[in-house]
Regions:
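Structural motif corresponding to the intra-repeat A-B loop/turn of tetratricopeptide repeats
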Residues: 82, 119, 156-157, 191, ...
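Short coil turns that delineate tetratricopeptide repeat
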Residues: 100-103, 137-140, 175, 209, ...
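TPR-repeat structural position
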Residues: 85-86, 122, 159-160, 194, ...
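Start-of-helix register in tetratricopeptide repeats
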Residues: 70, 103-107, 140-144, 179, ...
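Transmembrane alpha-helices and immediately adjacent membrane-cytoplasm interface residues
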Residues: 56-82
């Protein structure tokens, strides 16, 4: 992971991420408990139901581990990209609660902040983000953190120039992430740089088709930018496209 990056992950859990020793101990305990459960489960099934159930128990343990490690993060990301923020937040919360490493937990918590902001709860997102020490994050996590801080600032009427400075740092780290470029364009509109914003928004599709939810917001931002430039016809075209994509 980290989770999906956009204008967008409990504050108490995030605060603990500052203390690697405590986090490491928690993750070691979780991993040991999981290994123990996967080992004891088949043995107990065999003792109660007979030897054939040992193999069934092993298969179930492998399947459950795959569900936790692979399926759950992928479906959380997919729910976010489909704008199903409540579902995505529940899955990220479960990932964080069962994470075996500090990085996996941080990524899930950052993604939960994204869900909160995208769902219209920027104050909740801000509380989570404030619990992180930015200097302790790796590059991918820092991109998510910077992006989400910029989005919260824009969504709460903060200084658009400060939001732009945050997102420019994220772009310098990961210029290839369309959702980060979308945040950059939103900040450019907020500071009145409409031509620059249009250029960024148009370039977002250079790498291929976007997820429908992201394409819809891209079109809405293009409509806003063209409105500001006094081009209502262009703006109307992009609003129509946004409605079509969002269906």
């Amino acid at each position: 992971m980290p989770g999906p990056v956009r204008c967008w992950f409990s504050a108490g859990a995030a605060a603990d991420l500052r203390y690697p020793g405590r986090v490491a101990a928690r993750h070691v305990a979780r991993g040991a408990a999981w290994v123990l459960a996967c080992g004891l489960g088949p043995a107990l099934l065999g003792a109660v139901l007979g030897r054939p159930w040992i193999a069934i128990g092993v298969v179930l343990a492998i399947a459950t581990t795959g569900w936790l490690v692979l399926w759950l993060p992928r479906t959380a990301h997919a729910a976010f990209e489909a704008a199903r923020y409540a579902r995505a937040a529940r899955r990220y919360r479960l990932i964080a609660a069962t994470a075996f490493t500090a990085g996996r937990e941080r990524a899930a918590v950052l993604s939960r902040a994204g869900c909160d902001d995208a769902a219209g709860r920027p104050a909740a997102a801000e509380r989570i983000l404030a619990g992180f020490d930015a200097g302790a994050l790796d590059a991918a996590e820092r991109v998510t953190w910077l992006n989400n801080r910029a989005c919260v600032a824009l969504d709460t009427g903060g200084d658009p120039g400060a939001a732009l400075a945050l997102i420019e740092q994220a772009v310098a780290l990961r210029p290839d992430v369309p959702a980060v470029q979308h945040t950059r364009a939103t900040a450019l509109i907020a500071v009145g740089r409409f031509d620059d914003a249009i250029g960024v928004l148009e370039a977002m599709r250079a790498g291929g088709e976007l997820a429908p939810a992201l394409e819809a917001v891209r079109c809405r931002e293009l409509a806003r930018a063209w409105d500001h430039k006094g081009q209502p016809d262009y703006a109307a075209d992009y609003r129509d496209r946004a409605r079509l994509v969002a269906r």
